[in-house]
Regions:
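C-terminal accessory/tail domains of diverse enzymes
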Residues: 1-277, 285-300, 307-310, 314-345, ...
Length: 731
């Protein structure tokens, strides 16, 4: 049991106090997120390491969505296998299993319960797709038109679009007619036919009506349906038979009420024909009165895009339920590296902040809240590095605003001067949208991602939502809730007392001092002290398990009679290499060959000044940490891989042999291997926590004292004075 779980009663009580403060201030904060999971017993499989897709991942996704629908007691939701992300080099969009429902509890689907299961139903007629489309045409009272039949796909295509004519909405349909001496032919591929329609063969026939974009869920009253000119509609509903399943592909409509009416017409058609169906295609357009969750694949993980909730107790119930249902399927939120060190899923656990609707988002109502969050995180590197994954730095998935582009701080301060309470959302995006990005200008890869706040060029993404991306997946629900509570408390504090201190110019100190466990934890203590002064008392003991996993102890031993030595993992901002040409185009690898660790020595306070630390034959500098402790940070070449930085002339500097001396009197030391102690690599991941712990023990070996020699002093660096970089050694 982790420390957060052990102290859960106190944490939950503080959550209630923070909630009371948020309610009293009228913040109206809603929080969601994107937690990720892996299969506990299949971590060697490529789909749970680097691949996004996989058969087992898909089946687990189906099961998890089914369990969450039941556990959350969703009111007759719409279940749909939608189209997810589509990245360059991938042959098709990834799947996205979704459940959508109305906030007011009214059923979104009024037919027999839907499923996203791949299980087949009873045998169906060969013309089932045609029967379904013909009946749907009658239910929607569409003009008689011959749909496009695609025998090779066992599919029927019905062009369909909600339009607006004379200020009244209506359904429109049309015939699709192939060009002379040709046939309409779907595009090749393995995706649903709805994504492979031959739209370019239809020509440039203009639709004489505007598409309907209504948003009122219940007042949409369409007039008589319209027969549009042939080939003028470029959207279509597709019904296809896949084995013994009938699947209905929903087109991407922008009118929310039209989408809902189409869904109800499909449900009625299914009931009339007594024909079970499975929905696929596009989800409902985003609307404040519609909620949804999705289960999607990402490289190595299964991601849950969880719906936002508006109070602490709902957040607790939701998070605990999610972890429980995932665990019941054999999913976990923790894994181990080959060398036994604990790590997160690798897929992150982003946190989203917003409101019940874009108009009530606290970030748009009070732009100074956004400034406070950005500024306070910039002042406290522990908030950036203390909860992130192993890959940090300017080229990671969530770089700090001052990483890689230090000149941005000046521009950011100018932008902050323009933020006012009466500023419209588009102006907020114009001021900050280009500044919160990584070194390549990617706005999604930023610690504070504004892609869903109010992007001017993407109206469909104007949700009033801020995404905090520098959060890795915690191993249990209590730790996840502690993270969420930390953010909620900071929001409550900044709402009452905006944080508007000038931004700090950390320079190289950011990647020197603030990569060590000691510096991160000291900085985090100051964060908790600020919150305590604001009236929100966090006990540092609640975070003990988190920091034990974030900075694992590599080994410790008692040497001599009154000295002790401890090694802990430190952070290393891995660089991204230059472009490399391969069969799929170009790619950029990550150089993970360097490691950094913290040496902590404890001894008699009156003799500490005589301490000397020798690492691989070099005397290295150390910094005092209290009266009786010394800390040294060592950076070294842990392994050599093709194409890594710097040149291959620096061989792996392993093992690390550390010896302590009091003056010239040897005290003892240790030997540390970053990988297997025979100098090789482990071939398989640990199969259990016990095996992982044993690998860690094997890689750390106490050493007896040796005789003093005149050890050379390792050259220091003005840029990184607190880091002993063994790559600077000679010989």
């Amino acid at each position: 049991m982790g420390s957060a779980a052990k102290h859960w009663t106190a944490i939950a009580a503080l959550g209630d106090r923070v909630e009371a403060a948020l309610q009293a201030s009228g913040v109206e904060l809603w929080m969601g997120g994107e937690p990720t999971f892996v299969a506990a017993n299949q971590l060697e499989d490529l789909q749970w390491r680097t691949a996004a897709l996989g058969a087992e991942k898909y089946q687990l996704g189906l099961s998890l969505l089914d369990r969450l629908v039941t556990a959350f007691q969703l009111p007759q939701p719409l279940l749909l296998e939608g189209t997810g992300k589509w990245y360059p080099g991938e042959l098709a969009p990834r799947w996205a299993l979704g459940a959508y429902w109305r906030r007011d509890g009214q059923p979104l689907w009024r037919g027999e319960p839907l499923t996203v299961s791949t299980a087949t139903t009873a045998a169906i007629a060969t013309d089932a797709a045609q029967q379904f489309v013909q009946t749907l045409q009658q239910v929607l009272q569409l003009p008689v038109v011959e749909p496009w039949i695609v025998p090779a796909e066992s599919a029927v295509v019905l062009p369909l679009l909600p339009i607006r004519r004379a200020d009244q909405p209506a359904w429109a349909t049309c015939a699709w007619i192939a060009p002379e001496s040709a046939n309409l032919v779907p595009l090749e591929g393995e995706t649903p036919l709805g994504l492979r329609l031959p739209l370019q063969q239809l020509g440039d026939i203009d639709l004489p009506y505007e598409p309907d974009d209504s948003t009122d869920l219940d007042s949409w009253q369409p007039g008589p349906a319209i027969l549009a000119p042939p080939n003028s509609l470029k959207l279509a509903l597709v019904v296809r038979q896949v084995e013994q399943q009938l699947r209905v592909f929903l087109p991407p409509l922008i009118s929310v009420p039209a989408y809902l009416q189409l869904v109800q017409a499909i449900a009625k058609t299914s009931d009339i024909l007594q024909q079970p169906i499975r929905l696929e295609g596009y989800p409902p357009p985003r609307h404040p009165e519609l909620l949804g969750l999705q289960v999607t694949p990402d490289p190595g993980v299964l991601e849950v895009n969880i719906h936002p909730v508006g109070d602490w107790r709902s957040l607790v119930a939701q998070t605990q339920c999610l972890y429980q249902e995932a665990q019941s399927l054999g999913l976990t939120a923790q894994r181990f590296q080959f060398n036994g060190l604990p790590t997160d899923t690798g897929g992150g656990a982003h946190i989203t902040l917003g409101g019940r609707s874009p108009q009530t988002s606290p970030l748009l109502r009070r732009p100074d809240l956004l400034q406070s969050l950005i500024s306070y995180w910039q002042h406290h590197p522990s908030l950036s590095y203390g909860f992130a994954g192993w890959f940090i730095g300017p080229t990671c998935q969530a770089p700090r605003v001052d990483e890689g582009r230090p000149e941005i701080l000046y521009e950011l301060e100018l932008a902050f001067e323009q933020l006012r309470a009466d500023l419209n959302p588009a102006a907020i995006d114009a001021l900050l949208g280009h500044l919160l990005a990584d070194v390549s200008g990617n706005t999604h890869r930023a610690e504070f991602c504004l892609d869903k706040l109010w992007p001017s060029r993407m109206p469909t993404q104007q949700w009033g939502v801020l995404e905090l991306r520098a959060f890795a997946m915690p191993p249990d629900a209590a730790e996840r809730l502690l993270q969420l509570l930390l953010v909620r408390a900071l929001v409550a504090w900044f709402w009452r007392s905006p944080f508007q201190a000038p931004l700090r110019r950390w320079g190289t100190e950011l990647h020197d001092r603030f990569l060590s466990p000691a510096a991160i934890q000291a900085d985090f203590q100051s964060v908790l002290a600020d919150l305590n002064r604001a009236g929100f008392t966090f006990d540092p003991a609640w975070f003990a398990s988190h920091f034990a996993d974030r900075f694992p102890t590599l080994g410790c031993c008692t040497i001599a009679s009154d000295w002790s030595l401890e090694l802990r993992h430190s952070l290393e901002p891995w660089p991204v290499l230059a472009e490399d040409v391969n069969q799929g185009g170009t790619s950029r690898g990550v150089d993970a060959s360097l490691e950094r660790l913290q040496i902590r020595v404890q001894g008699p306070a009156d003799r500490l000044r005589s301490l000397r630390i020798i690492c691989n034959g070099w005397q290295i500098a150390w910094q005092p940490a209290g009266l009786d402790q010394a800390i040294a940070i060592v950076r070294f070449q842990a392994r050599q891989r093709p194409g890594t930085l710097p040149l291959a002339t620096i061989a792996p500097q392993i093992p690390l042999e550390i010896q302590l001396f009091e003056g010239q009197q040897g005290l003892g030391g240790c030997c540390y291997w970053p990988e297997a102690p025979d100098g090789g690599f482990y071939e398989q991941l640990p199969t259990s926590a016990a095996e992982a712990a044993q690998r860690c023990r094997d890689r750390f070996q106490p050493m007896a004292a040796i005789a003093w020699q005149r050890w050379p002093i390792l050259p220091s660096s003005k840029e990184f004075p607190e880091t002993a970089d063994l790559r600077r050694s000679r010989g």
